A protein has these predicted regions:
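Conserved amphipathic alpha-helical segments that form helical-bundle/coiled-coil interaction surfaces
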Residues: 108-170, 182-190, 199-209
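Short arginine-rich
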Residues: 209-219
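Short, flexible turn/loop "capping" segments at secondary-structure junctions
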Residues: 37, 69-70, 137, 180-182
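Short amphipathic alpha-helical segments with heptad-repeat character
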Residues: 87-94, 172, 201, 205
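Hinge/beta->alpha junction and helix N-cap segments in small-molecule ligand-binding domains
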Residues: 176-177
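Alpha-helix N-cap/N′ positions at the starts of helices
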Residues: 73, 96, 118, 180-183
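Short linear motifs at protein or domain termini
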Residues: 1-106, 217-223
Length: 223
């Protein structure tokens, strides 16, 4: 069972609803709750220290993100992503990120290009000391999508973010995958710096293909 320390909501200026949602989402992504595990409202109220209404609102949002699902006569459970689910998600991710890389070359400002390179340097430093690069990679992709200038594309990617991040966490847990992932990000930056939009798109798609293969291996190891 997840500890109260993980989920406890602090009394800060941030809205309670946002804190509950963030804490529950992170607990799922960090696998404090196992896929298929039932989430009991009463227990979540005790762990977080918030009202049942706040818990229900958070669970509805997590359902919209695809992280939990409601099963008749059982209640809310943590979603289980199968290898087929992952394959379909990464097909879509390949299209989205390939286009994002292309549009970044075509539309990004010099400041956005510098920001992307700076973020990769941050990822390098984290990887060098075997620290988690998940959040730093999230920021890298944010810069990439924003720099492309297509709001609809960014919104579509954001709608899949929670499920993809859960799978990314799995893939990066494989020995050697984090360093290979960082090397692939360098390939993306190199392609962007070349000014070749199609080359950047290919580098992004290649990175997603390799990540997808890693996810499949990670899911197979869990079964």
């Amino acid at each position: 069972m997840v500890s109260a320390e993980v989920l406890r909501v602090e009394r800060t200026p941030a809205p309670i609803r946002a804190q509950v949602l963030d804490n529950l989402r992170q607990a799922i992504l960090d696998r404090h709750f196992a896929p298929g595990q039932r989430l009991i409202e009463r227990e979540l109220v005790e762990l977080t220290g918030v009202s049942r209404t706040s818990i229900r609102e958070a669970l509805r949002e997590l359902a919209a993100e695809g992280l939990v699902t409601t099963i008749p006569n059982k209640g809310t459970v943590v979603a289980t992503l199968s290898a087929e689910d992952a394959r379909q998600l990464y097909q879509v991710r390949s299209v989205l990120e390939g286009l994002a890389g292309k549009l970044f070359v075509e539309n990004a400002s010099p400041a956005q290009r510098r920001a992307l390179a700076k973020q990769l340097a941050t990822i390098d430093r984290l990887a060098a000391r075997d620290a988690s690069i998940l959040e730093a990679k999230d920021r890298f992709y944010d810069i990439l999508f924003v720099g492309g200038g297509n709001v609809a594309l960014h919104q579509t990617a954001a709608s899949l973010h929670a499920r993809i991040r859960a799978l990314r966490s799995l893939s990066l847990s494989l020995p050697g995958r984090a360093r290979k992932s960082v090397a692939e990000l360098h390939d993306i930056i190199e392609a962007i710096d070349s000014g070749d939009a199609e080359k950047a798109a290919r580098a992004c798609r290649r990175h997603v293909a390799n990540a997808g293969a890693a996810v499949t291996r990670a899911l197979s190891a869990l079964t």
